[in-house]
């Protein structure tokens, strides 16, 4: 059963993921990595998303088993790496693979289990 905090975190995850999808729509890897402003905003949203994913309680994670919890747990420290190849790879992988899959499954869960996203006492 999700708590109020977990529901809020799921909403935050969805919002940050949607922001990343909008910001990166149509961008190639090189374009994203060259664009200081877009890159900075995308990285900020990814850090919010990854950090929020790590804070969701184990019981709530169990209710959304298709989300790649371990993948986000592993990606989180890489998104906080100093500028360089590790960060570039993490940034692009998150944008191309992790975010789309996460948003897809969140949409499915929101349709089939809306109570997971309901922030009510």
Summary of predicted features, one role per range:
Residues 1-121:
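Solvent-exposed interaction patches of small proteins and small membrane subunits
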